[in-house]
Amino acid sequence: MPTINQLVRKPRVSEKLKSKSPALENCPQRRGVCTRVYTTTPKKPNSALRKVAKVRLTNGFEVISYIGGEGHNLQEHSVVLIRGGRVKDLPGVRYHIVRGSLDLQGVKDRKQARSKYGAKRPKAA
């Protein structure tokens, strides 16, 4: 327990919060260009080929971001929008690419949770 005098000389300093998505620099989303589109495998108990892309952002950061949904039309030099949100079983992947925005199309024939995958409302039969 410090004395009052010690606190007057050197006050308590609150710990600074560290961002979980530093490349966004407090913005909700950021635009970037794909430098590499590839698949990678998840951590131990899971098994799959997860689609990811290395993206060079407008602020100069280069990040790995996840492409959600079934199928995509991304290739090198595609312009994409990224948002925060990590993928728990892919180390180093701390961002998601927004579906249905800029060069990335929405998921085809998606019926539920459409807004998360940039899919338009299907025509009523």
Swiss-Prot record:
User: Which PANTHER family does the record match to this protein?
Assistant: 30S RIBOSOMAL PROTEIN S12 FAMILY MEMBER
Gene3D superfamilies cross-referenced by the UniProt entry:
Nucleic acid-binding proteins (2.40.50.140)
Which keywords accompany this UniProt record? Methylation, Ribonucleoprotein, Ribosomal protein, RNA-binding, rRNA-binding, tRNA-binding
Superkingdom as given in the UniProt entry:
Bacteria
Looking up InterPro entries in the UniProt record yields: NA-bd_OB-fold, Ribosomal_uS12, Ribosomal_uS12_bac
Share what the entry says about its subunit structure, partners included.
Part of the 30S ribosomal subunit. Contacts proteins S8 and S17. May interact with IF1 in the 30S initiation complex.
Q: Member of which family?
A: Belongs to the universal ribosomal protein uS12 family.
Residues with the modification 3-methylthioaspartic acid, per the entry, are: D89
A single GO molecular-function term is: structural constituent of ribosome
Recorded protein name is Small ribosomal subunit protein uS12
Q: Which organism is it from?
A: Ralstonia nicotianae (strain ATCC BAA-1114 / GMI1000)
Gene name of the encoded protein: rpsL
